[in-house]
Design a protein with these regions (language model features):
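Hydrophobic side chains in beta-strands
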Residues: 5, 34, 46, 68, ...
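Short beta-strand and beta-hairpin "edge-sheet" elements
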Residues: 29-74
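Intrinsically disordered, low-complexity segments enriched in serine, threonine, and glycine
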Residues: 76-204
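"Short basic amphipathic alpha-helical interaction patches in structured regions
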Residues: 15-24, 61-62, 78-82
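A generic structural signal for short, non-catalytic loop/turn and secondary-structure boundary residues
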Residues: 25, 35-39, 57-59, 110, ...
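Short, surface-exposed linear patches
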Residues: 23-28, 54-56, 67, 85-90, ...
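Oligomerization/assembly interface segments of phage tail-like spikes and tubes
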Residues: 1-11, 58-72, 184
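Compositionally biased, low-complexity regions
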Residues: 2-27, 31
Length: 204
């Protein structure tokens, strides 16, 4: 991606040129957006060398080139929050039917998305699940206790936890939830605050 940075006034040639070089020297890929499409970002890294042009009157521009990591662009991260059941502590029958609620997510873009799911457990101990009825994928965390907090990255297949709950061989979580392009009908089961974070992906 070629880019021209224009400095229209108060341009201090050496000082600002060094500042731009320092800004470009960060390692790895980073998001970049443009005014024309402010809700879409590209992951890029600086490549090659920059060239400076100026007229000696505190005005100038720098030509630089960025390298994209993939043919995809990314929309802004969207967060949907859903509370299922009651946030109060229950002392009733643990075998009663768990709370359930439907929630729809409409995914923009051109590619499916593997979301991040955050779960804060309320009520009595029990399973928490998010089931996409469209493609039969889900997140399932079995036998959670009151106050348990988990963050599940379905893309990296990783779980972060702020609780003492331990999953065993016969009690493993499921985390293959996938959002398809368009409408996704999700069934939430169990008492919890559940947050779904997802990012539209666009093939360029």
């Amino acid at each position: 991606i070629p880019l021209t940075l224009v400095f229209e006034s108060n341009w201090k040639t050496e000082e600002n040129y060094l500042a731009v070089q320092a800004w470009l020297s960060v390692e790895g890929y980073h998001p970049i957006t443009f005014d024309k499409f402010p809700d879409v970002s590209y992951l890029v890294t600086y490549s090659g060398s920059s060239t400076l042009s100026h007229n000696g009157l505190s005005q100038g521009y720098i030509n630089i080139t960025f390298h994209r990591d993939s043919p995809f662009a990314y929309g802004s991260v969207v967060k949907d929050s859903v509370i299922i059941g009651s946030k109060t502590i229950h002392t009733g029958d643990r075998d009663e039917k768990p709370a359930q609620q439907f929630h729809e997510i409409y995914l923009k873009g051109t590619e499916p998305c593997l979301p991040v799911v955050r779960i804060t457990k309320y009520g009595v101990d029990g399973d928490i699940s998010v089931h996409n009825r469209r493609n039969n994928t889900k997140v399932l965390l079995p036998k959670l206790a009151l106050g348990d907090y988990f963050e599940i990255d379905c893309d990296l297949e990783m779980i972060e936890s702020k609780s003492n709950t331990i999953f065993t061989i016969g009690n493993l979580p499921q985390m293959d939830l996938r959002l398809e392009i368009g409408r996704n009908k999700l069934l939430f089961t169990g008492e919890a605050l559940i947050e779904i974070l997802y990012q539209p992906i666009y093939l360029q």
